[in-house]
Amino acid sequence: MQTSGNYQPVPIGFTVPSAPPSYEEATFHHPPYPPLHQGMDAKNMSNPPYIVQPVPMQPPVTVQTVYVQQAMTLYDRPVQMCCRSCNSMITTRLEYSSGALAWLSCGGLCLLGCIGGCCLIPFCIDSLKDVDHYCPNCHALLGSYKRI
């Protein structure tokens, strides 16, 4: 018979591999545990000590609540607001002081010829003065209103 292709005859002494091992042969059997020694009693054996390590404690976090008060525009009239100093609800107390508008009005009157004391009239008119707002309870300055 003639062989075609790259087939070669089986060499002499070659054995065909056998089937895989059976399930019993393939599973590994663990050896049994050794029996307890006669001198040892399982009831009296103590477990190794259980060491508990303390959990590291974090310092408590303190939260500070900050109330942001919107900038209040102050005018020449009393304003009802919460005092930043004593935290009470108040109506501001007004104090008038001579500001730039009073001095410019005085200078303008001097230029017009009102030298004989009439140029001091702007210092008597509250609507030409700057206004300071104070807390009536703690007397803290809460803000100012500048005319110029």
UniProtKB/Swiss-Prot annotation:
Pfam families per record? zf-LITAF-like
Q: Which SMART domains match?
A: LITAF
Write out the residues that bind Zn(2+).
83, 86, 135, 138
What's the domain of life for this entry?
Eukaryota
- Region (Membrane-binding amphipathic helix) location: 101-123
Q: What is its main location?
A: cytoplasm
Question: Which ranges of the sequence are coiled-coil?
Answer: none
Q: Where is this motif: PPxY motif?
A: 20-23
Instruction: Tell me the GO molecular function terms.
Output: DNA binding; zinc ion binding
Q: Where in the cell is it found?
A: Cytoplasm; Nucleus; Lysosome membrane; Early endosome membrane
The text the record gives for the protein's domains is: The LITAF domain is stabilized by a bound zinc ion. The LITAF domain contains an amphipathic helix that mediates interaction with lipid membranes.
Q: Which family does it belong to?
A: Belongs to the CDIP1/LITAF family.
Listed name of the protein: Lipopolysaccharide-induced tumor necrosis factor-alpha factor homolog
